[in-house]
Design a protein with these regions (language model features):
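Non-catalytic structural scaffold of enzyme domains
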Residues: 1-278
Length: 278
């Protein structure tokens, strides 16, 4: 198989990474994709850094064995904790979801007040604050000015997304508890720092108000994938395109939630896999 026709490998702790898959399909409809959702061990956000690194390595080994041309860590927790390690240990390009989201936040803020929500591990790592502040200097947009980043861990959003509870009363009440603090901070941009969170986008937007721009790291990541593949001459012509999905537990539940935003036939090629030997 030609290098450009090899699939893109994408992994996440569960269904959240399907938000990245959806955006990759929208931006790059000719590309083949292999997706791995580690549903047996979701969520990653409450695990220790050592455990997240172990899981991320196993996910990477599984996808590399299937001949991918690019690896996407479509999990903010994995991106925050293990991305640099995966890049050191892997001989193919590795893209995370934090850097694209941080760059988009800096581009879109007018006040310099940016909010970030994510899992406990992502927020504790400070990865978004670091990336936002670095990019604000590199871009020159906020040179000499200080960007204020307000962060909040929202761990219950992940199980809500995994259950498919995107817009019901429970989701709205949970969002209100988590996000009410942002109203006094006068943010004009809120980064959805977990790939599960775009599934709750309408509920989150309702809570923070229409005056706050929501940054979807999934969409920004898909744009960066397109740029990288184009620069390296690795865009596929789509002649042998396929999209395969693997999960580590409960494929029926994964399929039910996944179909809610990928469509009825979006997960037709779905299999269960054991990662213990990876």
């Amino acid at each position: 198989m030609k290098e450009k026709d090899k699939p893109i490998g994408i992994f996440d702790s569960g269904v959240g990474g399907l938000t990245v898959v959806k955006e990759v399909i929208r931006h790059l409809p000719n590309e083949s994709i292999i997706y791995l959702g580690d549903t047996a061990r979701v969520p990653y956000g409450i695990k220790s850094p050592e455990t997240v690194i172990k899981y991320s390595r196993q996910n990477t080994n599984f996808l590399k064995e299937r001949g991918i041309k690019l690896l996407v860590a479509a999990c903010n927790t994995s991106s925050a904790v293990s991305l640099s390690i995966l890049r050191e240990e892997t001989d193919i390009s590795v893209i995370g979801v934090i850097e694209p989201g941080a760059r988009a936040a800096v581009r879109n803020t007018k006040t310099g007040n940016i909010g970030v929500i994510g899992t406990e591990a992502t927020i504790k790592s400070g990865a978004y604050e670091k990336a936002i502040n670095q990019w604000s200097v590199v871009s020159g947009q906020w040179s000499g000015k200080k960007i204020e980043v307000a962060s909040k861990a929202c761990p219950m959003f992940v199980p809500l997304a995994e259950e498919g509870w995107f817009e019901n009363e429970v989701a709205e009440m949970t969002a209100e508890v988590y996000l009410s603090d942002f109203r006094g901070k006068r943010i004009d941009v809120l980064v959805l720092g977990c790939t599960h969170y775009p599934l709750l986008k309408k509920t989150i937007q309702k809570s923070v108000g229409t005056g706050v721009i929501l940054i979807d790291s999934a969409e920004e990541t898909a744009k960066e994938i397109e740029i990288l593949l184009r620069e390296r001459g690795l865009l596929s012509d789509g002649k042998s395109r396929f999209v395969d999905f693997y999960v580590t537990d409960n494929p029926e539940r994964f399929s039910k939630v996944g179909k809610a935003f990928l469509g009825e036939n979006g997960l037709s090629r779905l299999s269960a896999v054991d990662l213990s030997n990876y």
